[in-house]
Structure formats: structure tokens, C-alpha cells
């Protein structure tokens, strides 16, 4: 992709024009080109370009596009430090101001570079940082498949890969994209190995807390399989996660009574935890029983008789459980419930169900062929 130039002249003259323009705006820069070559000129121009960022958007974009067009003709090994310097300027200059302009300038640079250029990673990270400051992350490509491809294309080492994923995660969280953020965090934690899992302690801790805090997240068993999370075994945060994975409400109540300060230190709401654990307990009951008496509901969920109906209605709204209320017989009739954990037993049940469907379809097909040989 070509980037519009500041003026259609030679690179040396273009650098000279940029120097003159910046000096006219008050920058401390010589109007004479450096004897060190274009990359030295660009280093000095980028260092002084702050002054033009105060101008009108069109003027700023014209100047910055000129700088970008010169950057892109440099040898790859000379680009990296200069691009990093320019990105830092655009991210930090009057942070919070004119985000759409800064995003446009970074986007011009990003799309003007070859797709496989490693330093493109720096530009992408800068775009994410600016987008997060103005709640514009939805306009950024953060799809995991695309991000995975870039990680490969840019040949990122482990540290840069983790930094990129963590940055995307934090931006999504800041912009209230909790579901997308959770997927990115799982991707991040899943990229650690047995050898470096201990380094992800903070990320694993944060991932668990975010998941527990999210009012729309009810399934947690996949987190237990992540190596950094397994590294937390024996700690209170892991014990708490295990309760939300498979235990009942009473287990959470006992945990809370012994660890009130810990729950508060995590920034978790006890009332929200109670509400979520009631639903999770109900889900577990609904898997095992197709009919649940009001009395059992009251006892297991620690709610009053007058609250059972409202609870069931709210539970059905989450689409984790499908059931109806039988007022006459004072019971809840379950038609379906999501499993809180999905292990070998659940896979076997799924296999048996699919085999049964296959057999039934074969029977239907045979019956149709009997009625009509051409069927």
C-alpha cells in the first residue's frame, strides 16, 4: 500500500522541506540535512515532530504521511528504532487528546508496511493503546485468529507474544468487552509451558478474578486445565475457583466465613458471588434431577419459599437452565441444564446421544425407502 507523500520531490528534498516546516513551527532543528543520511534526518525530524501535532488534522496528517513515506523506503534494519520512536510520540503526545487523529496516523503507518514486517507489531500495539483510551477498540482488529496469524507472521518471541496478548486483553477489559477479553486471557495463559508457568502468576490470578466477577460468566472448568492456574494449587484463589467450578452454595458460604478479608481484597461482591453460586448449584441439581421440589430448592439455595419462582425465572433468563414451575405440586420441572464441567462422562453421554440420533435417522431412512424406492 502506498502512503501519500508530503510533496512529490526527491527524498533528500522532502526531508529538507520537513525540516524547514518544523523549524517554522518553532522546533529546534536545523534546516540543513544531516551528512549521516536519510535515517539520521528522520531521527531528528521525528524527535522534533511534536510541534506539528498542534496543527489542524489535515496539516498534521500531511506532515506525518510524509514522514511515514520516507520511513517506508528505508532498509528494514534502519526502520525499527525510528518507527518505535514515532509510535511512542503518537501514543504519549497529550495522552487522551485527538485520539481519532492519532489512530489514523498509526493506521496509515500500519497499513503502509509489508504484512510480515516484525516492527509492525510495535505499530499494532500502539494502535491498541490509543484505541483503549477512547473506547474505540471495536474498530481495531482483535479477532484471535487474526492476532494468532500476526504473531506467526511477525515471528514474535515469547515475551513479545505475551506482551501483545496482555495489551489486547487489558484494552478489551477497559472497553467492557468482557467475553472477548476472557478469550484473549485464556489464549495468553494457554501459551505458557510447564517451564515458564510460574511467570504467569499475576495473569492467572487476574484471569480468575475477572471470570468470577463477570456477571455473564458461569462456566469455569476450562480455567483449571491451564498450566499457570494449576501452578496456583494450594492457594486461596485456586480453592475459590474450584468451588465455582463444581461445589455447591454451602461450600462457598463456609469459604466466605473463613476468608471474608480475602474475598474483599479481590474486589469481589459477596452478594454477587452468592447469586452466581445459587445459579451454579441449581444447574448442578438440574443435571441430576428432572424434578426438584420447592423445599429442596429452599434448602440447597438458602432462599425463602416466596423467592423460588423469581429465582427460577431469573435462572431461565441466563439460558443455562431450561425449566418450568409446577405450582400445584410445588416443584420445578427441568427440561435441560448446562453441565458445569465437561469431562469424560459428558463426552460419553454426547457420544451415546449422537449414536442414538444416527440410529434413529437410519430407521427413518429405511422406512422412507420402503414407502418409496427412490427416496
Curated annotation (Swiss-Prot):
A GO term from the CC aspect: eukaryotic translation initiation factor 3 complex
The entry's keywords: Cytoplasm, Initiation factor, Protein biosynthesis
Gene Ontology MF annotations: translation initiation factor activity
InterPro entries: ARM-type_fold (IPR016024), COPS7/eIF3m (IPR045237), eIF3m (IPR027528), eIF3m_C_helix (IPR040750), PCI_dom (IPR000717), WH_DNA-bd_sf (IPR036390)
GO BP, sorted A to Z: cytoplasmic translational initiation; formation of cytoplasmic translation initiation complex
SUPFAM superfamilies associated with the record: ARM repeat, Winged helix' DNA-binding domain
S-adenosyl-L-methionine listed as a keyword: no
This protein's record includes keyword Ion transport: no
Classification via PROSITE patterns: PCI (PS50250)
Predominant localisation class: cytoplasm
Domain PCI: start-end pairs: 180-339
Localization in the cell: Cytoplasm
Homology family: Belongs to the eIF-3 subunit M family.
Subunit organization: Component of the eukaryotic translation initiation factor 3 (eIF-3) complex, which is composed of 13 subunits: eif3a, eif3b, eif3c, eif3d, eif3e, eif3f, eif3g, eif3h, eif3i, eif3j, eif3k, eif3l and eif3m.
Record function comment: Component of the eukaryotic translation initiation factor 3 (eIF-3) complex, which is involved in protein synthesis of a specialized repertoire of mRNAs and, together with other initiation factors, stimulates binding of mRNA and methionyl-tRNAi to the 40S ribosome. The eIF-3 complex specifically targets and initiates translation of a subset of mRNAs involved in cell proliferation.
PANTHER family for the chain: COP9 SIGNALOSOME COMPLEX SUBUNIT 7/DENDRITIC CELL PROTEIN GA17 (PTHR15350), EUKARYOTIC TRANSLATION INITIATION FACTOR 3 SUBUNIT M (PTHR15350:SF2)
UniProt protein name: Eukaryotic translation initiation factor 3 subunit M
The species this protein was found in: Danio rerio
